[in-house]
């Protein structure tokens, strides 16, 4: 009888734990006796993944916190490498967390261990020279999006498009009426979802612009309601402080978390660029993407970022599908103009395109990723 498959796996944050758990579940269906160990969060551990270290060891945010924890993170990496080189797994899977995982993968691959990196870093957008290290470090990159694979193909780097787990999770036709009932909002009003970002700097920069736009929109559409999901209590307090100063009388429904629900309930979405734009596309909502950075950050981004568009719907479509208002173009007046177009025009062609793009990346990513790992294992 062959030995059970041994799989090393590392996730560094909550999103990685969710992603890794989906993959582990599919691999367990193929290899019931498989043994998993590495750096694991609660969802992975609930499936039986042995945690050599807790995921919190890697879950750090911001440069100050990273620098403070760096000695510990480097110690964890040394001990992890020592363990896997002394007890080689049949395959190692690094889930996201590229700053940690790519270095681990490189050393393990040089030691003769097969390696997979799940979730391509945004190497197609900036710091493109990283592709050479990724190519040396991995036997396979599992990519969420088709244009990512196309980028890897240019460098003859092994990559497989597996689809996006978010596209698997979201139904092709979300139930707006049900979500409005759940949120307790008026089903007969028009609603705009306002998402000013998840980080402190984003919320600080984008909220004043979005609030000014909302004030103008209220004059134009007196029946318009606003839903504002904030990722946590801190961002909620930050947003409320800005609102108290700039728009104290503006009536808004504030939610903690529930970004997806807010977008499903809305008719149109106004958001800061990021993953939220992909989510808005998947829930089939016309959107206006706005983004503003500090002047130096923008100057730097112009030189580093190599893509024609900033939002994922436009990158997926390969054309300007939804309006992007970046830097000097991101004004309250321009936001009002673009949002108003969606309220005043028929959006069915746009929604149809969103549905086509949803189907393009809805491939049962967990299963596809497990299949790719199984092919590399060869058993």
Swiss-Prot record:
InterPro entries referenced in this protein's UniProt entry, alphabetically: Glyco_trans_19 (IPR003835)
Gene Ontology terms for molecular function: lipid-A-disaccharide synthase activity; phospholipid binding
Entry EC no(s): 2.4.1.182
Entry GO terms, CC: membrane
Reactions this protein catalyses: a lipid X + a UDP-2-N,3-O-bis[(3R)-3-hydroxyacyl]-alpha-D-glucosamine = a lipid A disaccharide + UDP + H(+)
Alphabetized UniProt keyword annotations: Glycosyltransferase, Lipid A biosynthesis, Lipid biosynthesis, Lipid metabolism, Transferase
A Gene Ontology BP annotation from the UniProt entry: lipid A biosynthetic process
Pathway: Bacterial outer membrane biogenesis; LPS lipid A biosynthesis
Lineage top rank: taxon: Bacteria
Pfam families listed in its UniProt record: LpxB (PF02684)
Function text: Condensation of UDP-2,3-diacylglucosamine and 2,3-diacylglucosamine-1-phosphate to form lipid A disaccharide, a precursor of lipid A, a phosphorylated glycolipid that anchors the lipopolysaccharide to the outer membrane of the cell.
Family membership noted in the UniProt record: Belongs to the LpxB family.
Name the record gives this protein: Lipid-A-disaccharide synthase
């Amino acid at each position: 009888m062959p030995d059970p498959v041994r799989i090393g796996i590392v996730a560094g944050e909550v999103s990685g734990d969710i992603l890794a758990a989906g993959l582990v579940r599919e691999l367990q269906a193929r290899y019931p006796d498989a043994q998993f160990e590495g750096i694991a969060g609660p969802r992975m551990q609930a499936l039986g993944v042995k945690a050599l270290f807790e995921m919190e060891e890697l879950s750090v945010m911001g440069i100050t916190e990273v620098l403070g924890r760096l000695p510990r993170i480097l110690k964890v990496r040394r001990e992890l490498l020592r363990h896997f080189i002394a007890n080689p797994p049949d395959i190692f899977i690094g889930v996201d967390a590229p700053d940690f995982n790519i270095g681990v993968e490189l050393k393990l691959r040089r030691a003769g261990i097969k390696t997979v990196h799940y979730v391509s870093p945004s190497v197609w957008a900036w710091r493109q020279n990283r592709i050479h290290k990724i190519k040396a470090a991995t036997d396979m990159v599992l990519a969420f999006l088709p244009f990512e694979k196309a980028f890897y193909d240019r460098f003859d780097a092994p990559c497989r498009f597996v689809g996006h787990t978010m596209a698997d999770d979201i139904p092709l036709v979300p139930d707006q009426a049900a979500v409005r009932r759940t949120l307790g909002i008026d089903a007969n009003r028009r609603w705009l979802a306002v998402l000013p970002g998840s980080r402190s700097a984003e919320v600080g920069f984008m909220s004043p612009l979005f609030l000014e736009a909302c004030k103008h929109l209220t004059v134009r559409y007196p029946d318009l309601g606003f839903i504002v999901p904030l990722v946590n209590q801190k961002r909620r307090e930050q947003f409320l402080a800005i609102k108290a100063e700039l728009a104290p009388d503006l009536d808004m429904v504030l939610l903690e978390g529930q970004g997806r629900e807010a977008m499903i309930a809305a008719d149109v979405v106004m958001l800061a660029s990021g993953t939220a734009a992909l989510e808005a596309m998947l829930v089939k909502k016309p959107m206006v993407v706005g983004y503003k950075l500090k002047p130096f950050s923008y100057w730097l981004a112009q030189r580093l970022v190599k893509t024609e568009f900033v939002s994922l719907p436009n990158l997926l479509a390969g054309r300007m599908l939804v309006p992007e208002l970046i830097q000097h173009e991101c004004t309250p007046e321009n936001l009002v103009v673009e949002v108003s177009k969606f309220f005043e025009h028929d959006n069915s062609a746009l929604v149809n395109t969103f549905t086509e793009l949803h189907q393009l990346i809805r491939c049962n990513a967990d299963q596809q990723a497990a299949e790719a790992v199984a092919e590399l294992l060869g058993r």
